[in-house]
Amino acid sequence: MEIAAETTGPAGVTTDVTNAEESTEQPATRYMQGWALASLTVAFMSICLVLAIDNTILATAIPHITSDFKSLNDIGWYGSSYLIAQMALLPTCGRLYAFYNIKWVYCLSLAIFELGSIIAAVAPNSMSLIIGRAISGLGAAGLVSGTTTILSYCVSLRNQAMLSPIVLGMYNIGSAMGPLIGGSITDNKVLTWRFIFWINLPFGAVALVLVWFTLRKPPPAVKGNLLWVQKLRQLDLPGATLLLGATTCLNLALQWGGIVYPWSDSKVFGCLIGFGLLLITFLCLQWRGKENANIPLRIFRSRTVSASCGFMMLVQVAIVVQSYFWPIYFQSVRNTNARDSGINLLPLIISNSLSTLCAGSLASRFGHYVPFMWVGPLILATGGGLYQLVRPDTPSGKWIGFQILSGVGYGCCSQMPILAVQVVLRKPDIPTGLVMIMFFQMLGGALAPSVGQNLFTDGLLRNLTKVQGIDATAVVAAGASGFRAIVPSELLNAVVDAFNSALRDVFWVGVATPALAWIASWAMEWRQLPDSKKKVTETPAEEGREK
């Protein structure tokens, strides 16, 4: 591969990969250029595209999946299983790149992601689909952390500044394409919804070939010389297992409580107790592990880091709930097909992407990011609150406007926590701070579908019991798009109203969580982005000391 020597050492993905002293003593680092750099960029663009499509393509297919599997109660798990696995294993996967050959770890992560897609595509029942999504989430954790790591190891800072927006821009494109592709595939009687998982394979194959032949001589692992016992200790596998178990228990409680079982039932209560005990054990383990822990607790001594993590989790809950349940409104209440529901979701996705770019540009120009964290949640909450005005016959102009408000609100503020941690933390701590922001963002995304599902199913059952002549359990079992086949025509409007009313309960989450995020934003330190010249040569902490 074509490479060039520079004197700037690459940054790691965790605080124990590099430190301030090491960065000044490292020899010249050889970076990619030319065709090798272009090939790697295309590979990462392909990966970002498939990950983005995979995140959004499922939303428009869920109503059909619930109808095929008679599994309306599993809506939350189709998204949560993927995000829980990705969230819980992200720090551990990130550390694998410090210990082992980055080429092999990345390619193995891609293979695991594709394996999960195959399992989901051939799933004979709902549980198999959930397992496949969880396996894909494990692979995605390795791909997300690996893309950042390989860029820092193999691409100069100057080229990173140019390539990162291009690579990440594919994520926005994929997010917009996902609902359209998912809807079109789901409506096709030949392909069916299963093909939305098969399409991951060609993208992954292209990326695998490019990465494999581009990284013929990958840089050595920065901690490859450690003993296997030391590597195992620093991976903190017990911590990852405890976190995975705690989050699963919480999701089971949210899925069952008040729907499958009463909240007072021993199964639900046991899951909540299990969540509490596992969480306490996990926190104790992180405290004892210090720098070897998955989540170094000392990083949260900074109030900006703590506020940013909480803020990111809360706004993520709001946007994921809306992304998952707007398609259910379109398909169950308005009786649109999956393709059209994907088109109808574009105002939310496009406004989100455009406002993210605009907010980032404005923050970079004026140097302040905190005001966007004040304004964004208020706009996001307004968009969620206005859903209370939505009815089965609401004109399209209104629900398009409501989605645009939500997208603009989220886009205004979603990137600001990432900037904040880079401003307030010392350079060696910045990678860990960024991982924590990603971690809490994924945590919010993992919890959101289950919270929304619980509110939706509980409200739907409650509303259906008021409609005489309707078997509420049968309607729920029929799924979000299949209930019309079993409901008498004279009762259809009442059942549709029951769906719409239940969805209004869900969208209150889109009001409450941004409001809490707005409160959290007031804990942010009022800091300014360093100017571009100082940003190259100094860390934010060093700049602050000079002033």
Curated annotation (Swiss-Prot):
Membrane topology: Multi-pass membrane protein
Predominant cellular place of this UniProt entry's protein: membrane
Annotated TM spans: 33-53, 74-94, 104-124, 135-155, 165-185, 195-215, 240-260, 267-287, 310-330, 343-363, 370-390, 399-419, 432-452, 506-526
Residue ranges, annotated region (Disordered): 1-23
Keywords: Cell membrane, Glycoprotein, Membrane, Transmembrane, Transmembrane helix, Transport
Superkingdom to which the source organism belongs: Eukaryota
Molecular function, one GO term: transmembrane transporter activity
UniProt cross-references to SUPFAM superfamilies, sorted A to Z: MFS general substrate transporter
Source organism: Aspergillus luteorubrus
Coiled coil: none
Location(s) in or outside the cell: Cell membrane
GO cellular component, one term: plasma membrane
Glycosites: 463
Signal sequence segment: none
Name the record gives this protein: MFS-type transporter ltbE
Function: MFS-type transporter; part of the gene cluster that mediates the biosynthesis of luteodienoside A, a glycosylated polyketide consisting of an unusual 1-O-beta-D-glucopyranosyl-myo-inositol (glucinol) ester of 3-hydroxy-2,2,4-trimethylocta-4,6-dienoic acid. LtbE is probably involved in the secretion of luteodienoside A.
Protein family: Belongs to the major facilitator superfamily. TCR/Tet family.
Pfam families: MFS_1
Gene3D superfamilies in the cross-refs: MFS general substrate transporter like domains (1.20.1250.20), Multidrug resistance protein D (1.20.1720.10)
